[in-house]
């Protein structure tokens, strides 16, 4: 796969404006990234900005805490798809996972999966808050629910992607889904190391810097 196609060019800042999202989309078209990743309020606008390109519109759901009801996540997903989302990055209910409420976590992921049938679903764990055993369980639940990717982090908590986490997730999805690394990927060497560890997609707001660092 071409290096540029590993990237979800991302702006999830709470103060992002339409001008910021327009710039994000123009950059993504210039470099032909896999997608732009935006908050739901900009789904339709990003889709419009990307018209005529191969760049996908990726939208976050239940972001960044994952701590709202499953019904709300399902509706948010349905609305994003109606507005033009090609890919959904959802956050699991981290507290329920840590409490061992695995059926509830599965149902949460499955509800979003059903709401974006035919679209790409990435499931965000927030690994900095989890033990290795919890990360492994989250992989199992995500695969069972039909996720296309498992994802390390939101980038909004206490830590981001690590090489060891990417390798752990890659091993425990057993080829049944892909791995996205996100959070703290800010230079070419880090991006390359994540890919070497098994990442199939990278989420970062430093994408242009990474591409320039490769040259």
Curated annotation (Swiss-Prot):
Belongs to the DeoC/FbaB aldolase family. DeoC type 1 subfamily. GO terms for cellular component: cytoplasm. Catalyzes a reversible aldol reaction between acetaldehyde and D-glyceraldehyde 3-phosphate to generate 2-deoxy-D-ribose 5-phosphate. GO terms for molecular function: deoxyribose-phosphate aldolase activity. This is Deoxyribose-phosphate aldolase. Transmembrane segments: none annotated. One of its GO terms (biological process) is carbohydrate catabolic process. It is an enzyme of class 4 (lyase). It comes from Lachnospira eligens (strain ATCC 27750 / DSM 3376 / VPI C15-48 / C15-B4). Keywords: Cytoplasm, Lyase, Schiff base. It is found in: Cytoplasm. The active site is at residues 89, 151, 180. It catalyses: 2-deoxy-D-ribose 5-phosphate = D-glyceraldehyde 3-phosphate + acetaldehyde. Its EC number is 4.1.2.4. The keyword Ligase does not apply. The keyword Lyase applies. Pathway: Carbohydrate degradation; 2-deoxy-D-ribose 1-phosphate degradation; D-glyceraldehyde 3-phosphate and acetaldehyde from 2-deoxy-alpha-D-ribose 1-phosphate: step 2/2.
């Amino acid at each position: 796969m071409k290096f540029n196609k590993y990237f979800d060019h991302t702006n999830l800042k709470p103060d992002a404006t339409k001008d910021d999202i327009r710039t994000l989309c123009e950059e993504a078209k210039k470099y032909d990234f896999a997608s732009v990743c935006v908050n739901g309020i900009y789904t339709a606008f990003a889709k419009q900005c990307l018209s005529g390109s191969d760049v996908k519109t990726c939208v976050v759901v239940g972001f960044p805490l994952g701590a709202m009801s499953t019904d709300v996540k399902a509706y948010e997903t349905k609305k994003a798809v109606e507005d033009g989302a090609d890919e959904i990055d959802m956050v699991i209910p981290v507290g329920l996972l840590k409490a061992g409420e695995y059926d509830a976590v599965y149902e949460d992921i499955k509800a979003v999966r059903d709401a974006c049938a035919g679209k790409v679903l990435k499931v965000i764990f927030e690994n900095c808050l989890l033990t290795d055993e919890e990360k492994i369980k989250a992989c199992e639940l995500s695969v069972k629910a039909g996720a296309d990717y498992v994802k390390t982090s939101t980038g909004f908590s206490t830590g981001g992607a690590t090489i060891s986490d990417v390798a752990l997730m890659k091993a425990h999805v057993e080829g049944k889904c892909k791995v996205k690394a996100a959070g703290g990927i800010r230079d070419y060497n880090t991006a390359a190391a994540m890919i070497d560890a098994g990442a199939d997609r990278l989420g970062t707001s430093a994408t242009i810097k990474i591409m320039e660092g490769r040259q």
